[in-house]
Amino acid sequence: KHGGATVFQPLSTGITFALTEKVPADKIPLITSGYGRSDTADGSMFKWNFPLIGHYWVAGDTVLQHIAKTQGGWDKLKGKKIAVVFHDSAFGKELLPIVTERSKMHGFELLLLPVPAPGVEQKAIWLQVRQQKPDFVVMQTWGVMTPTAIKEAVATGYPREKMFGTWWSGAEPDLKDVGAAAKGYSAVMMQH
């Protein structure tokens, strides 16, 4: 009342997790646009959270739908292997429930590859990709982690045409210095 915040928009998944527990008592709406806790889309459980224009489950599912479409349908993913390279944080792990559920529904194998912050040391991750030979790689990355992943994919010979990112994984400022090495890489995007 009188001088307090009318709304929180933290612009951070980690902060969103912390505030989600606090906003019901404070009765201040928490707005997230494309980030935050995906499970807050259930308004019956999270009455003070308002995830606008999608969340990480939407991004992950959109990527998986695209992969399924390029293969001729969901049934064609049965027996395939999809690696998920993700930032080892609340942000990165947000993708895991939807890819895990889709894996169970459609019979593809998941290879989960967490990358510790800040994401500049990925050689071991991409050696695993080379050894495990996934049919596709889905990336839940951001910042320096994204160009590092693409450079390591090049170094290990993994084709960028089989790499797909969620929205922060396609940020132009993060990819511009990679140049031609990123050719073939795709990411779903909100307006950036």
Question: For each of these PLM feature ranges, what is it?
Answer:
Residues 1-6, 11:
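N-terminal (or domain-start) structured segment
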Residues 2, 38-39, 47-156:
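Extracellular/periplasmic Venus flytrap/periplasmic-binding protein
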Residues 8-10, 29-38, 162-169:
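Short beta-strand elements of ligand-binding domains
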Residues 10, 34, 85, 116, ...:
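Conserved residues at the C-terminal ends of beta-strands
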Residues 15-17, 122, 146-148, 170-175:
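Short, well-ordered alpha-helical microsegments
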Residues 17-24, 150-154:
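Short Gly/Thr/Asp-enriched flexible loops that form oxyanion-binding sites at enzyme active sites
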Residues 36-42, 58, 169-174:
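Short gly/pro/ser/thr-enriched loop/turn and capping motifs at secondary-structure boundaries
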Residues 46, 153-192:
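Extracellular/periplasmic periplasmic-binding protein-like sensory domains
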